[in-house]
Swiss-Prot record:
Name of the featured protein: NADH-quinone oxidoreductase subunit C
NCBIfam families: PRK06074.1-1
GO CC, any one term: plasma membrane
Catalytic activity, as annotated: a quinone + NADH + 5 H(+)(in) = a quinol + NAD(+) + 4 H(+)(out)
Record's function text: NDH-1 shuttles electrons from NADH, via FMN and iron-sulfur (Fe-S) centers, to quinones in the respiratory chain. The immediate electron acceptor for the enzyme in this species is believed to be ubiquinone. Couples the redox reaction to proton translocation (for every two electrons transferred, four hydrogen ions are translocated across the cytoplasmic membrane), and thus conserves the redox energy in a proton gradient.
Native source organism of the sequence: Hydrogenovibrio crunogenus (strain DSM 25203 / XCL-2) (Thiomicrospira crunogena)
Keyword Transport: yes
Signal sequence interval, chain numbering: none
Assembly with partners or alone: NDH-1 is composed of 14 different subunits. Subunits NuoB, C, D, E, F, and G constitute the peripheral sector of the complex.
Organism ancestry: Bacteria, Pseudomonadati, Pseudomonadota, Gammaproteobacteria, Thiotrichales
Localization: Cell inner membrane
Amino acid sequence: MKQSVLDLQATIQETLGDAIVVSDIKLDELTVELAPEQSLSALTKLKEKLGFDQLIDVCGVDYLAFGDVTWETRKATNSGFSRGVFDFAEEDGEADTNIPRRFAVVYHLLSVENNRRVRVKVYPEDTQMPMVDSVVSVWNCADWFEREAFDLFGILFNGHPDLRRILTDYGFVGHPLRKDFPLTGHVEMRYDAEKGRVVYEPVTIENRVNVPRVIRNDVEPKG
């Protein structure tokens, strides 16, 4: 492990103090988790005091069903091999969406002057209406990044100057990168020749599992 990464970890811990929930180094990469109520002030210090002048990315993460495999069941089943094809949410029970630390906002920062990088995570406290402070006032480029996280994950950014959808269609319902959003979606669109316009209708595609999610524990990362 490069000593510079350890030095960076120590410097950030000294600068941010109790704003840090935990910091970790894996594969020579530093990840720092911040308390949500102190995230804006801590991120501001990372830029102004430690020279992280470049915000590379802001993204959302949904940890719903994290670590679960597609065929894992919570009770006995009599559906046999059909579980590998058809949707079995009704049989096995819907996933609990009100889990702690379901959503995370992840920031990737770069210090051009010092040639250092850090990953910062913030977990919103409210999973039903996840919200963190916007960092547009710190890095202007966060504008569209935060709009994308709002659009795809439904994460709210307090203080954002124009928080609206950026990728999905007008009138879109839901947030498509949430784990409980169906892969087939809710509606489909087509051109109706009689009406002379595009119409929206309930989706007709059958929700089924073609490639089950499998988690392998036999391969450990190097480093």
